[in-house]
């Protein structure tokens, strides 16, 4: 291969040589080349030069023609002061001079409009003044007067202040003296300096070398200005010239600040530490929003940890420990290092701002003993919490944290002394707030976070951050129990969280905010008054409708005796509260009612916005009843905060997770029975109060009622009415319903589609009593209600009696006062009530003991108090009077237990249920009317 390559290259070289020889032989002489015009001749004749001249002249003519084609119109040239407007013959140089002056005059007018004022010229060291005057002017101690300004022009005498145009045109070259003067732009400042030089007839050209203009511009300014230019004061120019000569270049003093050395990004040196002692003041609303978000995240973590902890332990031992330990801690530690907020004699508004002036007011957690173990990111996070700069090396960061490490050994507050921090809005709730916050200080080891927002809502998300109300609905499957059991793992985080709530800011910081808060309170009070008035108007309309309904009931139902029923309503609240600023006041309930807890996992008796206490007493055998609780409305639907009482909030059930309510066996109830051999099973649901006009009455969130069912003995079975009778009763009742719906639609209380909803409610399929299907499920799935016994699930007939209770459903679901979605009424009827006088034989003490039978179900004593008056018992059954309500009389739905139907024969006890149900709405203030409807109906 190499031999072939070398031979090939030799061949190419030989060919190249032969071609070169041929070309050298055939080349032409210089004369031939000159004759052919390829190269110029050695001696050029004169003809050649003439040809070159002609070529050049032709080129010039061509370029001129091209320029003439592209030139502007004469009108444009006149506007640009290049051509004269008049056609009079004048000499060319004078015309050009006038045009140049006109151009300069236009420039001067623009520069004069943008020039700086005399005060700026003094501050920029452009105008020479005495040092004392200059110091006073720079310190803003003396207002700049005309007498100190030797260089003030006549235009400046009208305004010594700075206009916005003047502040834009500061000199950037001299702006290092003061930081606010450093916002200058280059072009207006040089133009303005040129203006001053022209007007002062060049006297300042000696002083301002850095801002000198081209010579022709200053000369043209000295030659005289055209008509558009402003007149100049001659004496000012003369004074300035003489003074400038005498001063002979006024030297600028050196800038007090040293020049900042430019550093690369890794050589950053933090600013002086002294300036960082007090963090910059934050906007209070933004600081509150940040604090709410931080609290929300911390609570989310705590609730998730609590859920894991709850599933780890068995129910019973944890429950007893939860009952005993916090109460013992309350006895042992009544006073501790953390002073509760509720004892400080501040107004509620001041309480809402403690610890909220900035994020730095949070008390940070303790530092580890060895700072070297921390990473740089963790060190920076600790510095950020303490409001310190976070830049520098790791050693510098550790040096900044060391003084805080020494101070971090303070005693942390005990678990039993963490105080509920509530932030009421209205000033009328102050006595309730002060009295209840001391009692709610973790009496049972539960703490409850109130709403930290006392200002108008910032956004729909942040305004509803009443933390305890929003957490459980946001995390539906997480346990939102804030009643954290005192375990050594989580107590530290809880204490740091609550100490950050309690501590932080001195009351002196709050005094400056009083005037602003008073205005906010007045505005909120006006809003509350308006909303109260609207609610009263709506309540009057509902009362009128109720009166009409009562008249119809008296006319239609006088001849026939209606059958008793047992109604259970499961309701889902979707209405937005009409009083968004109303704060909730804790309501005391006696600790007589004990909470129910399931054995397998902690089921929810307490929805996030309410709680229900279940007192069960059974005799001789267990009754296992299952219930579905429909989840209550989420916090974006109800801006009201959670009930401010320490309560146990456990896992909110969904229809996929049925939870069972146990009732323990034993002869506990036998001592309370006087004549009847039947014990009772009482389930009381927490009531929610009306928002009364004086705004002192308690306001609650939506409760979630917990239902338990039991049946009576099989021996007392009576036959249901025949199918034809039930159909007739339903027909007459549905006609009455249609008439009432017409009235409501005409008055505007209901939308026009209420009639279709009513017809849908009546078309629920009937379940025959003889059938043995495993479940009896109603049509609305979100309010599904299943009934179970230990072995099997038993059907029941929800339509044994007439359907008049749908009127109440429609009133609550379609009225604008409170829309109630997915309400299902379950009724069990029989011909005659057999247990009408079941509570009549009880003395007051026995009835109270029956309600106080909390030994049956172990549970913590709830601070929520329900006062039962045993005297309010009539012949039809038990009525409870809610004594702390603002209503005149709270008429409870009294339900007498019916005879057992064949569908309930599989349930093993012979105990009826005296069943008190309330389904109410925060905005639906016609609670009296809803209860009266049931009382009139049955």
Curated annotation (Swiss-Prot):
- From which residue to which does any coiled coil extend? 516-561
Required for interaction with and ubiquitination by STUB1: region residues: 717-938
Q: Which domain of life is it from?
A: Eukaryota
Q: Where is this motif: MEF2C-binding?
A: 12-27
Chain intervals with Basic residues compositional bias: 248-265
Tissue specificity statement from the Swiss-Prot or TrEMBL entry: Expressed in the heart, aorta and bladder. Expressed in smooth muscle cell-containing tissues: stomach, small intestine, colon, lung, placenta and uterus. Very faint expression in prostate and skeletal muscle.
Where is the segment annotated Disordered?
A: 48-68, 154-281, 635-678, 693-734
One of its Pfam families is RPEL
Sequence ranges assigned to domain SAP in this UniProt record: 371-405
Location(s) in or outside the cell: Nucleus
Question: What does the UniProt record report as the effect of altering residue 530 to G in this chain?
Answer: In MGBL; uncertain significance; decreased function in transcriptional activation
Q: Where are the RPEL repeats?
A: 18-43, 62-87, 106-131
Q: Which residues carry this modification: Phosphoserine?
A: 451, 455, 459, 463, 626, 630, 634, 638, 815, 862, 869
Q: Which GO terms describe its molecular function?
A: DNA-binding transcription factor binding; histone acetyltransferase binding; histone deacetylase binding; R-SMAD binding; RNA polymerase II-specific DNA-binding transcription factor binding; transcription coactivator activity
The recorded induction information for this protein reads: Up-regulated during end-stage heart failure caused by dilated cardiomyopathy.
Sequence ranges of Low complexity compositional bias: 699-715
Please classify the protein's predominant subcellular localization into one broad category.
nucleus
Q: Which GO terms describe its biological process?
A: cardiac muscle cell apoptotic process; cardiac muscle cell differentiation; cardiac muscle cell myoblast differentiation; cardiac vascular smooth muscle cell differentiation; cardiac ventricle development; cardiocyte differentiation; cellular component maintenance; digestive tract development
Compositional bias annotation for Basic and acidic residues: 48-61
Involvement in disorder: Megabladder, congenital: An autosomal dominant congenital anomaly characterized by a massively dilated urinary bladder with disrupted smooth muscle in the bladder wall. MGBL is a sex-limited trait with 95% male predominance, and incomplete penetrance. Affected males frequently die in utero.
- Complex and partners: Homodimer. Interacts with SRF, its association does not depend on specific DNA sequences for ternary complex formation. Interacts with MLLT7/FOXO4. Interacts (via C-terminal) with EP300 (via the CREB-binding domain). Interacts with HDAC4 and HDAC5. Interacts with MEF2C. Interacts (via C-terminus) with STUB1/CHIP. Interacts with PURB.
What is the protein's name according to its record?
Myocardin
| Organism per entry | Homo sapiens (Human)
